[in-house]
Amino acid sequence: ATATGGRVDANRLPFQSFDLGKDNRSITVDVRNRRFNCDLQQYSCAPADSTSGGMAAPENSSVSPDGRTAVYIKNYNLYAKDLTTGRETQLTTDGVKDYGYATDNAGWTHSDRPIVTWSPDSRQIATYQQDERGVRDMYLVRAKAGNPELEAWKYPLPGDSVIFRISRVIIKLNPGGAPAIVRFQMPPDQHRSTVSDHIACAGGICDVEWYPDGSHLAFVSSSRDHKSAWFRVADANTGAVRTLFEERMPTQVGDASLRENLWRVLPASNELIWWSQRANWLHLYLYDLTTGQLKNQITTGDGNVDDIVRVDEKARQIYVMRSGAEVPGKDPYFQQLYRVGFDGRGLTLLTPENANHQVTASPNGQYFVDAYSTPDTPPVTVLRDANGKVLQTLERADLSRLVAGGWHPPTPFHVKARDGKTDIYGLMFTPSKLDSTRKYPIVNYIYPGPQSGSVGTRSFSPARGDNQALAELGFVVVAIDGMGTPGRSKSFEDFYYGHMGDNTLPDQVAGMRELAQRYKFIDIDRAGIWGHSGGGFASADAMFRFPDFFKVGWSESGNHDNRVYEDDWGERYQGLLVRSDGTDNYAAEANQTYAKNLKGKLMLVHGLMDDNVPPYNTTLVADALIKAGKDFDLLMIPFARHGYGQDTNYAMRRRWDYFVKNLLGAEPPKEYQVGKPGIVP
């Protein structure tokens, strides 16, 4: 409370997770969009951009692992500040506008914080010089009294001849001496990664890992269309680069749901643990770190490796989270901890509970903290030894107050996909006072991916957006992960690759129809759909492609035409703009192509200052609807970005009103005030 200047209730802490300091005497937490370091001995907190030396790090800086140095961008160059003495050192000198170092100032997400990855000894940083020269601008217009303001930034689109390129470098800080720049001896890389549609991951660069001694940097280069990825190692002293092997897929290499590297370099044994979906599942493989030759496959069979929890080099064992396999009575999305040898032998399940497990290893690897739960059962947190034996139950979540207040969990279900064979999974939200003799309209909350799905976490969550709130107004609300979303096999994940207009919609319709047969209180003749971003694309798409099934749609901030969205997204999941035969690869997937099919009630919503999905996506759909003579509703939020910020609750209330009036057939209360968003007690 002292650090934030606000009131904090000990029973409702304003954070859900924390990072334990290396000394085990402090934690780092994120509160109200700020990060704080908290001393567990003194019970005091301070902003994380200040250090134990008492000297504040510059705003938007990256602090070294030892906490002594901060690196930041100034005038397109990198500077370092010694947080003990306050001395500032200019690390680079040739950075200029549109060709700066470590910049994150362009594309669909941008900030002023440098993208760097520190070496373990805090003496070097891996980064790049980003070439934005010649990249086209995107524009937004901010309204104000008098002349409006033009906002412009670099934002390439699919098919552009010039897109971002990065020249990789290592910068040696050389405290007490002159800094040195080591440029990689290779052409500039594409602005691509295997684990994101960006190159920033967890505060650093995606797809890079330092050798423990800082002598080399391992990294992955991806092709523009994501069909190829090359594993490479750079000498940190000379910049010489070795390419060990190429990973290639007919669709796209990578799994953007991972959001972090799923490979490890092991210089002590001259080996690499690599991941691949070449066998239709995400498995681990052991490679020779010198020759790039495959030694053996580590994990096999049905199921994915979702995370590497720990690598025990001495025992030659890996602890991994796995999911994806079809086991009767088990949700295939549940992640569980396994141990397996480098040679692929001895695969052992260590967390047998039929639930989704979130596991953290102790620094010495002798213990694991395991929090497991399901969408409808509360978390249990236990302490396990390295063999999975439960040593102590640390905590059991108590839901009694939630239940006393009328709360009830969603209902997990599985139904058949469009093919009538494949199981797909979802959650159903019903009114707390459900009358099974009544008929309730059904609303589908959709996010089609491809990098995630509608359901979200398979762990317990007391609230999932406003799904339950909408259900309380008299609806059945469902979220279904259709074919073309991650967490299953590669063929499942890539099901609609190259056909983004699919949006899992045939699976949504099939699943909703099956649920209506199973639960007689569902009125399948009154079906609605809504979503945001990719879900906005999908919900409008649903109204155009399934006009006789969906009666009401609410489409927020949709990337309705991926020719008007950032280059990396479409080129990863749809392919390049122009096919090999010279024809357009995107027009058939754009929503305005099918707007003439609208029959039901549709609301289009977009923030006019959306710098992720430009509002012109919605403008094109609106224009097509007007040209087709269709009635529709339009809500443009003047100052909202991709998220609606202070206008979030207004948009949510309007959405509730829209479904109540047009799908439920009732009159909502006029201008109901939901409350102010973002207030943390």
Language-model segment annotations:
Residues A1-P379, L383-R384, S400-A404, I424, ...:
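Beta-propeller folds
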Residues R136-D137, R183, I205-D207, G214, ...:
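Serine-hydrolase catalytic core recognition
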